[in-house]
Amino acid sequence: MYLKSLKIYNFRKFGTNNNKIEFVDAKSFQEQRNKKEVNIAPTTTLIVGKNNCGKTTIIKSLDNLINNNKDAFKANDFNFLYLKKLIEYYEQAIPKLDDELKEKIKTPYLQFNICIGIENNSNDLVTNIVRFMKLDDINNSELKIVIKVELENEEVFIRDVKKLLEKNDNSSLRFNSFLELINDSDFKINYYNTDNDKIDNFNIKNLIELRPIKANNIESEKCLSKAFSKIIEYRYKTLFEEESDNLNSTIININRTLTKLISEKHTVSINKSLEEIESNEKLQVLLRADLTFQNVMNNLIKYEYVERNMNIPENQFGLGYTNLMMIIADLIDYMEKYPENSFNSKVNLISIEEPETFMHPQMQELFIKNINEAIASLLKSKNKNVNSQLIITTHSSHILNSKIHSGNTFNNINYVTTKNNYTHVVNLHDDIIIPKSEKKAHKREQDLKFLKKHIKYKVSELFFSDAIIFVEGVTEETLLKYYIDDNNKLNKYYISVFNIDGAHGMVYHNLIEILQVPALIITDLDIERDDDEKKNFKQISDLTGKFTTNKTIKKYNDDSNSLEELQHEQLKINNMYIAYQGKIEEYYATSFEEAFILTNYKNELLNSVLKKMKPQIYENIMGEGDDFTKIKENSYKLQKKLSNDKSDFANELLYKFITEDITIPSLPKYIKSGLSWLAKKLEGEE
């Protein structure tokens, strides 16, 4: 058996929509089971998202339910928006309670829907769960369990709510009193099937085990010694009883030898001295050795690592390495102690929350690979068949990369964010990110392969960004970061800028829409020119009969590459804003550099950079005078001459932005409009 999904209703930030967390699909689980080599990566569930979005809530809900901890659910665990709507309902319903109202009064509850996958020809014990199963469930090889945290006495609760409403007129005081009432009320955990039939004498703990592993568990300089001492102690006491008896016999003999030696060397001499003070019948000391198995485990085991044949003590370990080893120590402890029959008859979950603590990026990138190899080694050495699912919560882009590349898939990744004050879960899957297509099967495979590889190079930050900007060149990538930092509306948000050319950037569009992160895509008109126009550096002032080579514009322009009827300067598609050049100072720019030159052709700083970068060309254009309209009229020529020096051009501009007290050039209008849209989107105005 394995955990397929969990739906959370009204618990903390969770509401009633976009509340499903997917763990393992049948295909991934079966593929892992059929492989000879252990590889937990494809079935590892990753829960990613920024801080305070609901990642920990998912693990907490499982922990409370599995441990049947009904007392752990307090008023603060209910979604406050849900409770506010509930009290508004009471204000309307309770006055009608005695006469008009016929239906049952609603009471606060939490709900958790668990879906368990069952393997075909499985040896899993199903006697305890058959009451939850329906014919459809059997056909789908799954069962669904509905768990509700409900009031023990609804009548008393409704009576107390009525008193509360009569007593408090102030809405704020009412709500606080309502929270106190919920805290003072007793709740129970009930189980139902999907027909809402109550199932008695059932406990989810008999079906699911959860082992939470704390990632940030470094309490002292000797935490590793303590952790591994516990493991060795358990192994001796449980797995190697005969050796344990031999060790205890050795300890007893050591105590006898030491006690005899101490007695001969010290005890007799000390007692003779004491006889001078008091009779030895009244005052005498006994010195003896007291070495125990526990003392050996706690104090005599030293944890060291070897570096170039030198033993390095534990307190010189880096925190990241110590953190990783503590996690592995917990895994060893878990697998050593857990009985084989429990692994095969239950859903076994291991959760690790935010393991990236103290780890440097490279260690994070290899985290799942390291954990996978540790588990594989443990299973091989113990000859155990451990049917466990790993659940990791993280806000590290490196751990995300680790999951994608170790498992070679986007499957089983849950992106958690907040939307309208509710937790919003997005379930990722290869088939959603790059939809299947019979006609374009090969291209789909290539796109998916590209995305898995390319996302490693910083683009994984889009999962943790407030907004993202895609650009197609080094100039706009370099300069935009400066302009964003200088923008008081945007600089308070985490905005990532990615430089990906348009054709490859399109591979990300499905993912961007799925994640619903506001995305500004800055692209170029890429006006198609004939050979004469290129040779003579012809300026374009009219788009009649003109076409674009830009695949992004073509895709969202009804698959047409004609520029004649193209919407002016932008295309809006859901959470994406595609910005491109409109007419600037009488001309249409074909690139960002040309648009920047056209917008700022009179700007002193820009002219000084152009003159420095291309002195001969600049002099030929300007001649003896200072008529800057000549710069405007030769914008295409200038951008073509700069095409091999874009990085130098961008850095020279940036250097002058920072060091010179002079008017900074403006961004082109199409980019300004895009940034304005982004600001409104982030502030909830769009």
From Swiss-Prot:
InterPro entries linked: AAA_GajA/Old/RecF-like, Bact_Antivir_Def_Nuclease, P-loop_NTPase, TOPRIM_OLD
Pfam families: AAA_15, OLD-like_TOPRIM
Group of enzyme by EC: hydrolase
Binding positions (ATP): N52, C53, G54, K55, T56
Names of required cofactors: Mg(2+)
Site entry (Interaction with GajB), positions: R131, K134
Region (ATPase domain): 1-423
Residues that hold a divalent metal cation 1 according to the record: E472, D559
Positions contributing to a divalent metal cation 2 binding: E476, E604
CDD domains for this protein: TOPRIM_OLD
Region of interest: Toprim domain: 463-599
The keyword Lipoprotein is annotated on this UniProt entry: no
Entry-linked PANTHER family: ATP/GTP PHOSPHATASE, ATP_GTP PHOSPHATASE
Protein name (database record): Endonuclease GajA
Origin species: Bacillus cereus (strain HuB5-5)
Encoding gene per record: gajA
